[in-house]
Amino acid sequence: MISYEFQTHLPKGKDSSLNASSENKELYVQATHFNNTILLQIRLNGEMDSTYEVSSKGLNPILDINVPLAGNLGNTGGDYDDEEEEFVRDHLSDYQVVTKLGDSADPKVPVVCVQIAELYRRVILPEVSGTMAQDNMQFSLLISMSSKIWRATKEQSADDNDFGKLVFVLKCIKDMYAK
């Protein structure tokens, strides 16, 4: 069992969907690696109110093609239909997200969980020396987090800065392993 921790404050631009009356929003990230499971806790001011289990399913274990996340970004200069020649990988179909505790109707959280799982599969697990570094990278990820990170207030639209929040959380997870 190996454990990692990271603690930071949310920048003012990232916590606009949270209660504006409180200033310091503390984000605490902790990961505990077991033999075949990673327990990831993402706390906002010490609170966690939802738990999700992310496991590898779909075509990923069978067909592990190393395709960039954005597909083929280069222009080959040929006049042909890109849809016929290019294989686009849907990473959402590679994982199964099961809500253990929390709002199962929230459409944002499964996407967040899949992005965290992709970060682990592509970046973190290959870099962590000897820890679960297997050829097929089969692992289960148990994510407990505060859903308040993704909630919007009445004054703003539902998707206001969600991408920025996701990038910030992913960066915090990656920085946790850099220490």
Swiss-Prot record:
Annotated gene: IRC25
Taxonomic lineage of the native organism: Eukaryota, Fungi, Dikarya, Ascomycota, Saccharomycotina
InterPro entries for this protein: Psm_Assembly_Chaperone, Psome_chaperone_3/4
Gene Ontology annotations of biological process type: chaperone-mediated protein complex assembly; nuclear-transcribed mRNA catabolic process, non-stop decay; proteasome assembly
One Pfam family it belongs to: POC3_POC4
Keywords assigned by UniProt, alphabetized: Chaperone
Free-text function comment from the UniProt entry: Involved in 20S proteasome assembly, facilitating the alpha-ring formation.
Organism: Saccharomyces cerevisiae (strain ATCC 204508 / S288c) (Baker's yeast)
Chaperone as UniProt keyword: yes
One GO cellular component term noted in the UniProt record for this chain: protein-containing complex
Name recorded for this polypeptide: Proteasome chaperone 3
Ranges in a coiled coil: none
Record family assignment: Belongs to the PSMG3 family.
The protein's assembly and partners: Component of the 20S proteasome chaperone. Forms a heterodimer with POC4 that binds to proteasome precursors. Interacts with POP2.
Gene3D superfamilies reported in the protein's UniProt record: 3.30.230.90
Additional information: Present with 1820 molecules/cell in log phase SD medium.
